[in-house]
């Protein structure tokens, strides 16, 4: 998937897992610029460039919400150019019209037989919320006068939760949280505590660059960060799929 507004639990049902598409260390974007023009943002063009290069051939489907126009153009070009799923008969693209149409997205069930029952969705939400709980707990260690974790380290850990299967990293996050409780704070003095706000900030090197200047990234609010992407999802008596879809910003 390509946007923070995609409801992750609906993509992380038993037998499936999601990964947020990135294009790290992108060089030339000539092919993507040819199809999308230079007026569109570098992030959307980098994704299309990587797709044309075959960097996302591991995927079995691509699901995207009706987010920004530039991201929609990137996905539309991927589909028109047949850049993904060339040798996968069941591959499909899906555009989610959320939150205006927050009903079930049954594409994964129709093509791959994925369980989309309420029970399966509630299980995926519980797993998602556990990841959110751990990330928020780890992030609390950034508040101290002498932080026990750097902003760069926190960004690397948070970024992993958008790319890896949740069930494979929960125990690693739990180990990290326990380690931080006894970790000796860095004696390095920071001249300023910085909040980084933006959209697709997925380059950990950018956070490291800020901290190498003497600042400390103590909080974040961007699409690959802990706010708002690692907000827990509170279920109620409604259909869980509807809650997941309508609850994303």
Language model region names:
Residues 1, 108-230:
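A charged, amphipathic alpha-helical module
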Residues 45-110:
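Acidic/His-rich segments in extracytoplasmic proteins that coordinate ligands and/or metal ions
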Residues 51-57, 61-63, 67, 115-127, ...:
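Extended, charge-rich low-complexity interaction segments
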């Amino acid at each position: 998937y390509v946007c923070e507004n995609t409801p992750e639990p609906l993509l992380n049902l038993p037998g499936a897992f999601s990964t947020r598409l990135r294009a790290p260390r992108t060089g030339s974007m000539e092919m993507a610029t040819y199809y999308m023009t230079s007026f569109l943002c570098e992030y959307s063009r980098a994704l299309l460039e990587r797709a044309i290069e075959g960097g996302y051939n591991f995927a079995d489907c691509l699901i995207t919400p009706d987010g920004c126009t530039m991201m929609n153009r990137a996905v539309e070009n991927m589909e028109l150019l047949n850049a993904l799923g060339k040798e996968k008969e069941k591959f499909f693209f899906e555009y989610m019209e959320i939150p205006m149409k927050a009903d079930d997205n049954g594409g994964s069930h129709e093509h791959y037989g994925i369980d989309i029952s309420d029970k399966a969705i509630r299980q995926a939400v519980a797993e998602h919320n556990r990841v959110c709980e751990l990330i928020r707990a780890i992030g609390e260690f950034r508040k101290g006068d002498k932080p026990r974790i750097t902003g760069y380290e926190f960004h690397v850990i948070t970024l992993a939760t958008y790319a890896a299967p949740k069930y494979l990293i929960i125990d690693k996050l739990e180990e990290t949280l326990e380690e931080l409780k006894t970790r000796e704070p860095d004696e390095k003095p920071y001249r300023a505590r910085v909040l980084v706000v933006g959209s697709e900030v997925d380059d950990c090197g950018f956070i490291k660059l800020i901290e190498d200047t003497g600042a400390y990234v103590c909080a974040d609010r961007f699409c690959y960060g802990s706010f708002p992407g690692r907000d827990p999802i509170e279920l109620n008596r409604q259909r869980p799929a509807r809650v997941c879809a309508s609850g994303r910003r």
